[in-house]
From Swiss-Prot:
Keyword Oxidoreductase: no
GO-annotated cellular components: host cell cytoplasm; host cell nucleolus
Organism: Human immunodeficiency virus type 1 group M subtype D (isolate Z6)
Record's keyword terms, sorted: AIDS, Host cytoplasm, Host nucleus, Host-virus interaction, Methylation, mRNA transport, Phosphoprotein, RNA-binding, Transport
Protein name (record): Protein Rev
Keyword RNA-binding: yes
Pfam family, one: REV
Motif Nuclear localization signal and RNA-binding (RRE) location, chain numbering: 34-50
Modification sites for Phosphoserine: 5, 92, 99
Motif Nuclear export signal and binding to XPO1 per UniProt: ranges: 73-84
Posttranslational modification: Asymmetrically arginine dimethylated at one site by host PRMT6. Methylation impairs the RNA-binding activity and export of viral RNA from the nucleus to the cytoplasm. Phosphorylated by protein kinase CK2. Presence of, and maybe binding to the N-terminus of the regulatory beta subunit of CK2 is necessary for CK2-mediated Rev's phosphorylation.
Entry function: Escorts unspliced or incompletely spliced viral pre-mRNAs (late transcripts) out of the nucleus of infected cells. These pre-mRNAs carry a recognition sequence called Rev responsive element (RRE) located in the env gene, that is not present in fully spliced viral mRNAs (early transcripts). This function is essential since most viral proteins are translated from unspliced or partially spliced pre-mRNAs which cannot exit the nucleus by the pathway used by fully processed cellular mRNAs. Rev itself is translated from a fully spliced mRNA that readily exits the nucleus.
């Protein structure tokens, strides 16, 4: 199995070259003509781009043997997840993004469904 990774790299390069040729065969539309003509050309160009994208995905999955469905992500149990805003909460929307805060104790999130 010493040459297996080289074969896989070569397959990947073939797939990338083929996909590159597909994208090069569909240049962007020209900016000439009436507004309606330009709009129609852009619409047809975007449809061809979508087709090329789906063909490229099929080529990659064929050459690389990728599964169609993504690999499931292992998440911690929901009862251990906690939104903790006690430290450094900003209003920019980017602070605090990253690994989830996991509390030590497991608080009861949902009761059994009976009201008091």
């Amino acid at each position: 199995m010493a040459g297996r990774s080289g074969d896989r790299d070569e397959d990947l390069l073939k797939a990338v070259r083929l996909i590159k040729i597909l994208y090069q065969s569909n240049p962007p539309p020209s900016p000439e003509g009436t507004r309606q003509a330009r709009r129609n050309r852009r619409r047809r160009w975007r449809a061809r781009q979508r087709q090329i994208h789906s063909i490229g995905e099929r080529i990659l999955s064929t050459y690389l043997g990728r599964s169609e469905e993504p690999v499931p992500l292992q998440l911690p149990p929901l009862e251990r997840l906690n939104l903790n805003c006690s430290e450094d909460c900003g209003t920019s929307g980017t602070q605090g993004v990253g690994s989830p805060q996991i509390s030590v104790e497991s608080p009861t999130v949902l009761e059994s469904g009976t009201e008091e």
